Amino acid sequence: MTQSTTEDTLLRLAAVIDSRKGGDPEQSYVSRLFHKGDDAILKKIGEEATEVVLAAKDVRQGGAPSALVGEVADLWFHCLVALSHFDLSPADVIAELERREGMSGIEEKALRKRREREENGG
């Protein structure tokens, strides 16, 4: 799968998720999540993140890698719901990843801390 195809897939899925805002919670799982509010969405992300960890541990012990892929897909999906809820999109995340590209994690973390200090007047 190419990068543009991956980005296109995320943007298409995000558009479908956005279209569920204000929808009938009896007809759509995503509409139901939006209707319940951000606490329900965030709780679901926490649950899915835990399932990713457990699936990864299973793979480490010889479990099916496809289970891990499925759990990561669930996590990404619910993260897309959260982004939509807060009027953000995958493009915002992609832009941030592109900004970090080529920068070591240590360097990126130091830069982030420096920015936080500057923003807080320190």
From Swiss-Prot:
GO cellular component, one term: cytoplasm
Recorded catalytic activity of this chain's protein: 1-(5-phospho-beta-D-ribosyl)-ATP + H2O = 1-(5-phospho-beta-D-ribosyl)-5'-AMP + diphosphate + H(+)
Keyword tags: Amino-acid biosynthesis, ATP-binding, Cytoplasm, Histidine biosynthesis, Hydrolase, Nucleotide-binding
Compartmental location: Cytoplasm
Primary enzyme class: hydrolase
EC id: 3.6.1.31
Principal subcellular localisation of the protein: cytoplasm
Pathway note: Amino-acid biosynthesis; L-histidine biosynthesis; L-histidine from 5-phospho-alpha-D-ribose 1-diphosphate: step 2/9
Keyword presence, Nucleotidyltransferase: no
Any Pfam family: PRA-PH
GO BP, sorted A to Z: L-histidine biosynthetic process
Gene3D superfamilies cross-referenced by the UniProt entry: MazG-like
Domain of life: Bacteria
Amino-acid biosynthesis found in the keyword field: yes
GO molecular function: ATP binding; phosphoribosyl-ATP diphosphatase activity
HAMAP family (UniProt xref): HisE
Similarity-based family: Belongs to the PRA-PH family.
PANTHER family noted in UniProt: HISTIDINE BIOSYNTHESIS BIFUNCTIONAL PROTEIN, HISTIDINE BIOSYNTHESIS BIFUNCTIONAL PROTEIN HISIE
Official protein name in the record: Phosphoribosyl-ATP pyrophosphatase
Taxonomic lineage from the root: Bacteria, Pseudomonadati, Pseudomonadota, Betaproteobacteria, Burkholderiales
